[in-house]
UniProtKB/Swiss-Prot annotation:
It comes from the Eukaryota. Auto-ubiquitinated; leads to proteasomal degradation. Its main location: cytoplasm. This is E3 ubiquitin-protein ligase RNF220. Gene3D superfamilies: Zinc/RING finger domain, C3HC4 (zinc finger). It comes from Bos taurus (Bovine). Pathway: Protein modification; protein ubiquitination. Residues 277-297 are annotated as: Disordered. PANTHER family: E3 UBIQUITIN-PROTEIN LIGASE RNF220, E3 UBIQUITIN-PROTEIN LIGASE RNF220 ISOFORM X1. GO terms for cellular component: cytoplasm. Its EC number is 2.3.2.27. Residues 485-513 form a coiled coil. One of its GO terms (molecular function) is zinc ion binding. It catalyses: S-ubiquitinyl-[E2 ubiquitin-conjugating enzyme]-L-cysteine + [acceptor protein]-L-lysine = [E2 ubiquitin-conjugating enzyme]-L-cysteine + N(6)-ubiquitinyl-[acceptor protein]-L-lysine.
Amino acid sequence: MDLHRAAFKMENSSYLPNPLASPALMVLASTAEASRDASIPCQQPRPFGVPVSVDKDVHIPFTNGSYTFASMYHRQGGVPGTFANRDFPPSLLHLHPQFAPPNLDCTPISMLNHSGVGAFRPFASTEDRESYQSAFTPAKRLKNCHDTESPHLRFSDADGKEYDFGTQLPSSSPGSLKVDDTGKKIFAVSGLISDREASSSPEDRNDRCKKKAAALFDSQAPICPICQVLLRPSELQEHMEQELEQLAQLPASKNSLLKDAMAPGTPKSLLLSASIKREGESPTASPHSSATDDLHHSDRYQTFLRVRANRQTRLNARIGKMKRRKQDEGQREGSCMAEDDAADIEHENSNRFEEYEWCGQKRIRATTLLEGGFRGSGFVMCSGKENPDSDADLDVDGDDTLEYGKPQYTEADVIPCTGEEPGEAKEREALRGAVLNGGPPSTRITPEFSKWASDEMPSTSNGESSKQEAMQKTCKNSDIEKITEDSAVTTFEALKARVRELERQLSRGDRYKCLICMDSYSMPLTSIQCWHVHCEECWLRTLGAKKLCPQCYTITAPGDLRRIYL
């Protein structure tokens, strides 16, 4: 058998960009030529370097001599009927390019074309390339792998021929066994399957396929959605019945708890704790779900329930108080309305049929027969009954004694005005006497000390003398007592007091002046009605003419005047 002609084609080598550097050379047998006649003598390969036979030692591209290919790969035994007497490492057929010698062209080595993807068969087209899965993703099962009785194997050699095993023939037929054995032999030669799989019987392969299928289905084992327990197919019916029984027992247990909680005399705190515990319990609780129980009975969830219950209790208490207030108000309104209705009914009954006697005969007043009496007939009538909303508590004058003290002036202190006609003067005097009730008039201000003394009666003396007298009277202070001619010391002290008063007036600059007499205040008074300030004489003379403030015309009585100090 020519092992070199089909094994090496250096012209199409994809792993030797440079000329051959190493003197070592490997000669391998292809799978396609493995089925040929072994009696054909081996031919020498084309001269591309130093020819090396199969019997020579293979060059190992590792520095350590003890690290051999035998330690990396196990030698494969001979396959009956193909390579009985050959002793070469068949595991080198699927050696990865990184571990191959640098001068070896592995392009046409049977189905293991390293120009593609190393130890796998060459990609014929894009569809074949896409059909293979990545080494980092789970392997996909073929459609025919679900049927353990019909194994499906595909194989392609270096020439592009594909072999399909187990597609048409059943596994029990001898033809299928023959094809399966042939495929196993080819895969054994190529090194893709182990000796145990190649030499195993069809029954062993079927058992292994069933185990693989069971292992695959174990990853998809059913899980109970309630208690999260892995179940076997034989346990599904029993577990479902158990869950249904637990579900039927839940309402009965809750009803018993509610009946116990609603028993008379149960405190609200116990009811609240029972409700919190009932809400905290999971409806899907089971002895197998300890993780879910811990989650639902966590401290955080219990705190949330307690806070929510306390908040609802406070809100309910407020609502209850509001309802009680509304009920009390409604009862009060109802009682008031009932009393009013009863009073109206009594009043109507008392006045419905009014009887009176006339000429010894009892008669019924016709107006009482009308509904509403005179009011119903359109007449306006005054009720003889006193109105409860009278003005008895209304104080029109007001009592300012507590706030402003006792009155300091009365009607007797008012200075009456003198009219030009004697008739008017008499009328004023009579009116004043009636107001005073025969009391004596006040001597608070005498004509001698009055600012307005020059206005009383016209003088018959010289004008100069009258002016001088007026000046003297104007400049006189009311606080200074009448000075006698004999007391010189008293006169001296009075003059000093007057000088000091004038100095104070000059120092103030006459900032405060009465708006009536346009002079400095001799004795300022204010009214508690409008709080305007005038001289005492100005106030009393104004109130003698009219009971109004001379500045704002507010009604003012003598009792409203109060003394102030500037």
